[in-house]
Amino acid sequence: MMESSTILQRRALFNEAGDIELHKRRMVGGNTTNLNDFNNMKYPWVSKWYRQAMNNFWIPEEINMSSDVQDYRNLSAIEKTAYDKILSFLIFLDSIQTANLPNIGQYITANEINLCLTIQAFQEAVHSQSYSYMLDTICSPEERNDILYQWKDDEHLLARNKFIGNLYNEFQDDKSVLALLKVAIANYVLEGIYFYSGFMFFYNLGRNNKMPGSVQEIRYINRDENTHLWLFRSIIQELQKEEPQVFTARNVRLFRDMIREGCEQEIKWGDYVIGDQIPGLNRHMVADYIRYLGNLRCENLGFEPLYEGHRVEPESMSWVSQYSNANLIKTDFFEAKSTAYAKSSAMVDDL
């Protein structure tokens, strides 16, 4: 067993002395050969996760964005500003994920978990591809660049990115078990809380028959993020079993505070970018939903809830889960690919 301050060692790539017995496999501090054997996995949930993630494969350019070109020009000034800022936020954090996940994987010694992290990194790259396709379709090159880099000049955007980015950077400098857990919690916050006011904005556009292509892109991104949330929740739960001594009362308070901070930032962000001027949404709806998510995320890790009440999904926001529920997106079993989105006649091949 390790202590919070124990420094993790980067796993060797070739390790002829690595353990092959399943009972010796560990999330961290193990002695892996890095051999991927799909018939012998220590963690039973990995096989189901892997198949689900693989079945989720989608191609952004197959979603028809033709209606969005005109819709984007017809959005109100407030809706357009929200669209641009939310997209800038999503673009940056999905981009940094592709760099962060391999960094985490170097210190994970359960090879089947690294398979999952590799798939997640690939899906984050697809999300970046999706955002690029969305911008290329609806924007001029000048507008595109302005949206891409708004996070550098908008203090609200920058503060949000710094919270997650600094936690990721911390693990660059501190390879302790506690630092790894903090970066895992940061991922959990990112996938399970940080994106949701953005997602609900797009889904609200969909409810009002606006930007259907963008809504469908976001819906598929949301489905992927749900599997990523499942992955990091499971990683944290396995670490709770394997390294229970690290989950001291003090550290659990730290983790809960991180989740709380993520919630409060998401609520402030919703107040700033959505407020009370978007038809169909207001700041109270956003805040209630985020507090509900914060409690849900804590309870799923066995932590005490953060907010009094807020234990069930707000009735006024039930449409969010209807849009984001992966089970509502049809999958062709034989082709093992999604068939729920309309294919565009134009496929770009310039990546």
UniProtKB/Swiss-Prot annotation:
PROSITE patterns: RIBORED_SMALL. Fe cation 1 binds at D94, E124, H127. Its EC number is 1.17.4.1. The keyword Oxidoreductase applies. Signal peptide: none annotated. Binds 2 iron ions per subunit. It is an enzyme of class 1 (oxidoreductase). Keywords: Deoxyribonucleotide synthesis, Iron, Metal-binding, Oxidoreductase. It holds the Pfam family Ribonuc_red_sm. InterPro entries: Ferritin-like_SF (IPR009078), RNR-like (IPR012348), RNR_small (IPR033909), RNR_small_AS (IPR030475), RNR_small_fam (IPR000358). The keyword Protein transport does not apply. Belongs to the ribonucleoside diphosphate reductase small chain family. Tetramer of two alpha and two beta subunits. This is Ribonucleoside-diphosphate reductase subunit beta. It comes from Treponema pallidum (strain Nichols).
